[in-house]
């Protein structure tokens, strides 16, 4: 007989998530992350992203349950916790590769971060951002004027990217969305779909008069002058989903939401 998986339950600070964790650990035990087989994240999408950033290198599959305001990356939480082991056994994996971001700031400092949803550049003041865009070392747009621009993964393409009128990308398509944010010029440019191995480099053309910040998921860096983005070749995380509502189906369904 196969032993049940050891589960590490992580909860957001929200009261419903904390209460659910107490009930689940009483039922299934409370295992430390380093000795667990599976991570169960209780909260919303923000907490899921936080969990991936903090523990993604552990290579533990993550099964999320929605106890927050937004739960696109989560499964439904059910009051009957007795079926959790069956759900985990039936769960289907989704493999996500984050974006790697490298930044140079106006002060000369360097920084880096990962993003599972998107990397977005935004103007810091009322002045529009002026940016250039290079793809694999070739300048594709010499000057983009607008509020900003972003690069989104397939998993993140239904979030901020979609709100900015970017395309929804199928999971496993090995593509990225390059989407301008409120572009003024070029007027007719509405973004591009890139191969996942494309290196994207943004340069801020007037960083003193028109400062720009960059955010990788929730990690913001201000006063940037150059940002380079590529899909990570080393890091990959595994999310687990109920088969009747897996991530691929959710992304597909978003394209027909009315």
Swiss-Prot record:
It comes from the Bacteria. Its main location: cytoplasm. GO terms for biological process: NAD metabolic process; NADP biosynthetic process. One of its GO terms (molecular function) is NAD binding. It is an enzyme of class 2 (transferase). GO terms for cellular component: cytoplasm. Keywords: ATP-binding, Cytoplasm, Kinase, NAD, NADP, Nucleotide-binding, Transferase. It catalyses: NAD(+) + ATP = ADP + NADP(+) + H(+). Its EC number is 2.7.1.23. The active site is at residue 45. It is found in: Cytoplasm. Pfam families: NAD_kinase, NAD_kinase_C. Its cofactor is a divalent metal cation. NAD(+) binds at residues 45-46, 117-118, 147, 155, 158-163, 182. Involved in the regulation of the intracellular balance of NAD and NADP, and is a key enzyme in the biosynthesis of NADP. Catalyzes specifically the phosphorylation on 2'-hydroxyl of the adenosine moiety of NAD to yield NADP. Belongs to the NAD kinase family. PANTHER family: NAD KINASE. NCBIfam families: PRK04761.1. This is NAD kinase. The gene is nadK.
């Amino acid at each position: 007989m196969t032993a049940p998986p050891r589960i590490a339950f992580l909860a957001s600070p929200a009261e419903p998530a904390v209460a659910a964790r107490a009930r689940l650990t009483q039922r299934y035990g409370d295992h430390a992350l380093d000795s667990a087989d599976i991570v169960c994240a209780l909260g919303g999408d923000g907490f899921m992203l936080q969990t991936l950033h903090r523990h993604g290198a552990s290579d533990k599959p993550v099964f999320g349950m929605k106890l927050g305001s937004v739960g696109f990356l989560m499964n439904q939480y059910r009051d009957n916790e007795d079926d959790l082991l069956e759900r985990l056994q039936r769960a289907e994996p989704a493999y996500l590769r984050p974006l790697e971001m490298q930044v140079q700031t106006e002060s000369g400092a360097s920084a880096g971060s990962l993003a599972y949803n998107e990397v977005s550049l935004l103007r810091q003041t009322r002045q529009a951002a002026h940016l250039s865009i290079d793809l694999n070392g070739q300048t594709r747009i010499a000057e983009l004027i607008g509020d900003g621009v972003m690069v989104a993964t397939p998993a993140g393409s239904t979030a901020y990217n979609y709100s900015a009128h970017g395309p929804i990308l199928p999971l496993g398509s090995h593509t990225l969305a390059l989407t301008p944010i409120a572009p003024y010029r070029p007027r007719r440019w509405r973004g591009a779909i890139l191969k996942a191995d494309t290196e994207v480099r943004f340069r801020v053309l007037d960083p003193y008069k028109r400062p720009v910040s960059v955010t990788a998921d929730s990690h913001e860096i201000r006063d940037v002058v150059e940002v380079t983005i590529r899909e990570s070749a080393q890091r990959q995380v595994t999310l687990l989903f109920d088969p009747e509502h897996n991530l691929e189906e959710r992304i597909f369904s978003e394209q027909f939401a009315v």
